[in-house]
Amino acid sequence: MVKTLGFIFTFFAFLSPVWADSIQTPPPAQPVPHVVPSPPKTAAEAYILIDYNSGKIIASQNADMRVEPASLTKIMTGYVVINELSNGNISLDDMVTISPKAWKMPGSKMFIEVGKKVSVHDLIKGMVIQSGNDASVALAEHIAGSEEVFAELMNKYAESLGMTHTHYMNATGLPNPDHYTTAEDLSILARALINKFPEEYEWYAQKKFTFNGITQYNRNKLLWQDPSVDGLKTGHTESAGYCLVTSAKRDDMRLISVVLGTDSAKQRIQESQKLLNYGFRFFETHKLYQAGQRLNDARIWEGQQDTVGLGLENDLYVTIPRGQYKNLKIESTIDPKITAPVNADQPLGELTVSLNDETISQKQLVSLSPVEEGSFFKKILDQIKLLFKSLLGFLGL
C-alpha cells in the first residue's frame, strides 16, 4: 500500500508539509531551477561542513583522510569528562591533586603546580579555554587513574559514536603515530557534544579564563570575529598544521565546520569563515516533522484494533538549497499486510523525502503504540476479510 504525501507548492510555500490525501493539491509545478555555486576553495588539507540538525554534509574535501588531530583531541577528552560528570562518577567540586606527569606536560598549559589541588571545574576551563595539556592529563588521571587507561575510554566513546577512522593514544593530542582521526569523525564528535550536553557546551564560548593570577584567552578568534560562533576548539602542532572545529548558529540553523592542516592561525580562521558563510548563504534547514507526531495510519489485521498510528522515532530535518522548500516531495510506503501483535516503535513502513526527483532523506515509519492480538472471533473475521480481499485482487476487482 503506497500513500503519496506530497507538496509542490507555488503559492503556499510558507505552509508546513502536509499529507496529500488531506488536501486537494494543484497540478505538479515544474521544478524551479536553482543555482548553488561550488564550495569555496580553501587552503586546508582537509575540511568538512555539515548541518547540525540534519547531519547533511554540505561541503567536504578529503573528509576521510587520516590526520593528526593535535589539540582537537581535547574535544573527545572533554566529551568523556562531561559524560563522567553526567553519570555522577565525578563532580565539578572534586579536588584533583596534580601529578608530576601532568605538571611537566609540554605545549600549552594552564600553569597548574605539582602537588597542589585544583577543582575539576577549573581544570575543565583550563583544558577547554586555555587548551592546557597539563589540565587534560590531570583530568584523565582523576577519572581513569592513568592517561593510558583514559585513552581506552576515549576509544570506546569514539566507537559508540561511529567514529570509525579515529584512534586515541593520549588526552592531549601530542603527536603519536597511532593517534589519528578524520575531518568527518570530528564533525560527528562535535555534533554529539552539542546535542548531548547543550549546557556544558557553553564553556566552549568563553573567551578567557584566569587561573593562578594568569589570564589566557581562547585561541578561537572567531568568537570575537563572528557573533554567531559559539565554539569549539583549536589545534596545532608542526606536523598537523593549524586546525579548527567551529560551530555557529544563525536564526534556527546551526553549522559545524572542521578545517585541518592550514599554514597559520590566521588562515584557519579565514578558511573556517569562508565555509560558514557559504553554508548559511546558500542553504537552509527545515524541521519537517517531530518525533512521535502521527503522520499516517496502518491497517492492522487480527488485532484488538484495526489501525495504528505511524510516525518517526526522531525529529526529521532536511537541509536544502535556499528557495527550494516548495519543491520538496514526501512519500510514504506502508507494509501491505500487518498482523497483530505489533510492538511500539516497530517499523511498518518508510518515509521518503525528495527534491526535484532526487531522494534526500529516507526514514522508517514506526508504530506509535502497541497493538495486542484480537480475540479468536476477531482473528477468524479478519482472515475471512483477507481471503475476500485476495480473491477480489485476483479477479482484478
Predicted regions and their residues:
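Domain-terminus/edge residues, biased toward the C-terminal soluble/receptor-binding domains
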Residues: 163-167, 175-180, 184-397
